[in-house]
Amino acid sequence: MKRWLSLLTLLLLLAFPACAEQETRIIDRITYPGAEPEFAFTPDAELLEIVFPQVLNADAMLLRSGGHAILVDCASAHQAGRVTTMLKELGVKKLDAIINSHPHYDHLQGFELVAKAVEVGELRVAFPADYNKHMLKAMEAADELDVPVEFYGDGDVYTLGNATLTAWCKGDDTWNCNERSAVLKVRFGSATALLTGDMLYRTQIKLLETIPAEELRADILKYPHHGLNKLNDDFYNAVSPKFTVITNNGTKPKEGKKYLSYKHTAFAFTVPGYVSLTTDGETWLIQRLTPGSLVDENAYADEMQEE
């Protein structure tokens, strides 16, 4: 009987593939400001929010769901104030965790300032504690601020409300830091996002070789390495993003901007204003929130540092 039920289930999935994986809807009010003006999530809807602060050539993103909040990366020391300002304006007083994709200054150096501004439950890292000076500094700050440090690796899953973040750490010790960036696949209902750190071409090839194509597919793509590099075509086709966020302004990331324009993929830069992506698991509402003050989109807060 069980075998018959399994066969029947398989036949139903083959006959109605749309039922197996619901297609999410995108309401993009950044590209199309007047899109579906009457739409709003129901007051009791459980939501996942992803919000990008006004950082450029650096990464930080807030994820909130089910009364919990985390940061993925925390920008540089010079731009951490932009992160803490956003947290204050959005009413975030506690972060369950800060998850670091890789220990470069523009992704990890802001940890100390953020952890002094809000309560941080833990710092999660995917590299050895002594990997470089930025890791050593973060470990020292975590110790001084009594923030526990947890190490994560390939296949580990982090739960945020009813959302999950699955880590893909496919690089090896011979790869450079950017190439070894942890990639996080976010799932919430049928909605998905891919957060890619600063991964480069080699990482994309490795993901294609080790992750099933259907697992790579994502509605939202955080474009890797601040839009400075072209994507591998096969990787892009596997992900097939409906919307992409570039953590930069409109002048520096020429390759990413050009590539997405060629692919006719909607995208947004993280300055000026906050890029907000909210979903109930079926629909993404994408809009730009107006902060208390706008940063100059052509002015970098960082002097280029040794990564």
Predicted features by range, described:
Residues 126-131, 173, 250-251:
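Short histidine/acidic/glycine/proline-rich micro-motifs that form metal-
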Residues 3-21:
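Sec-dependent N-terminal signal peptides of Gram-positive bacterial secreted proteins and lipoproteins
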Residues 51, 99, 124, 150, ...:
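Hydrophobic/aromatic beta-strand patches that form the interior of the parallel beta-sheet core
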